């Protein structure tokens, strides 16, 4: 896994470096904020699940600004693309502690059902490292925004990230042994998609689609504040460490995804 991470980061770096040779200006920034992780823990579209399974993320971001040239400190030719698009690169990390909430583990069910107790006692976490790019579209002029302190620049984006995930699954039920059948809710004991059980502590990697909506605020001529609401869909259902057999349990067949509300600061290097 470390070799794969190094290879992806190097490829990512040199691709940006090659693009940078065209003279576009650069921006760097830091983002952070809460991450609501939607997984096989809890009940989907349930408020307690959404609120309870919320973690935290932090990231470094880099932008290529096509409207300005760093090599001559001048504007690029005025085209629609140059004045309305930026290319964002990102290296980020998020971690979320996970547990079961919702209608299957209400106090009434916990008082009467051992299965409900087993489900509630199953907990976990996942840590995800992202590296990827997004193309941001600004409906208003980037040039006008750059020249006007106190202005706003709303945007939407779409891109792809490569993700390295490290889940942890454990139980507090009985003697706390995860591989003891009597300690685990039955549906997680069934083999699933090449694994012996519907849970796994194996690290892995996968692609994801990333889309966001947000805005910038021009703080100074060389700095912006940013707020960004992002949706990220993983091409795997093992990111959280749980994946009950999707054929037998179709309610759990959806892949994992998250929503990240991040706030950040951006500085113009050129």
Where are the predicted features?
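Short glycine/proline- and aromatic-enriched beta-strand/turn motifs that initiate or cap beta-hairpins
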Residues: 20-71, 266-270
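Short loop/turn motifs that connect adjacent beta-strands in outer-membrane beta-barrel proteins
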Residues: 20-24, 65-84, 125, 141-153, ...
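Residues that define the transmembrane beta-barrel architecture of outer-membrane proteins
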Residues: 24, 50-56, 83, 127-131, ...
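Residue-level detector of the transmembrane beta-barrel scaffold of outer-membrane proteins
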Residues: 27-29, 86-88, 155-157, 224-226, ...
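Residues on the lipid-exposed face of transmembrane beta-strands in outer-membrane beta-barrel proteins
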Residues: 30, 34, 58-64, 70, ...
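Structural signature of outer-membrane beta-barrel domains
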Residues: 33-39, 65-67, 92-98, 161-167, ...
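Predominantly the C-terminal beta-signal and adjacent terminal strand-loop region
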Residues: 39-43, 48, 206, 211-270
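Extracellular/periplasm-exposed beta-strand and loop segments of Gram-negative cell-envelope proteins
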Residues: 43-49, 96-130, 165-206, 238-258
């Amino acid at each position: 896994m470390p070799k794969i991470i190094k290879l992806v980061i190097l490829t990512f770096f040199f691709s940006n470096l090659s693009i940078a040779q065209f003279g576009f200006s650069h921006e760097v920034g830091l983002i952070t904020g809460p991450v609501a992780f939607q997984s096989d823990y809890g009940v989907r579209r349930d408020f307690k699940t959404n609120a309870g399974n919320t973690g935290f993320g932090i990231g470094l971001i880099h932008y290529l600004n096509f409207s300005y040239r760093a090599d001559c400190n001048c504007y690029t030719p005025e085209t629609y693309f140059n004045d309305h698009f930026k290319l964002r690169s990102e290296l980020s990390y998020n971690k979320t502690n996970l547990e079961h909430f919702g209608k299957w583990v209400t106090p009434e069910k916990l008082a009467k059902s051992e299965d409900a107790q087993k489900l509630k006692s199953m907990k976990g976490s996942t840590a995800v490292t992202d590296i990827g790019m997004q193309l941001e579209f600004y409906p208003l002029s980037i040039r006008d925004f750059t020249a006007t302190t106190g202005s706003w620049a709303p945007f939407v984006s779409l891109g792809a990230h490569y993700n390295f995930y490290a889940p942890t699954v454990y139980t507090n039920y009985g003697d706390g042994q995860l591989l003891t059948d009597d300690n685990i809710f039955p549906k997680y004991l069934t083999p699933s998609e090449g694994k012996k059980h519907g849970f796994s502590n194996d690290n892995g990697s996968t692609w994801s689609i990333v889309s966001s909506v947000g805005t910038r605020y021009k703080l100074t001529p060389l700095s912006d504040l940013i707020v960004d609401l992002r949706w990220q869909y993983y091409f795997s259902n093992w990111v959280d460490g749980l994946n009950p057999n999707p054929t037998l349990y179709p309610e759990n067949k959806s892949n994992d995804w998250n929503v990240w509300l991040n706030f950040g600061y951006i500085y113009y290097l050129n």
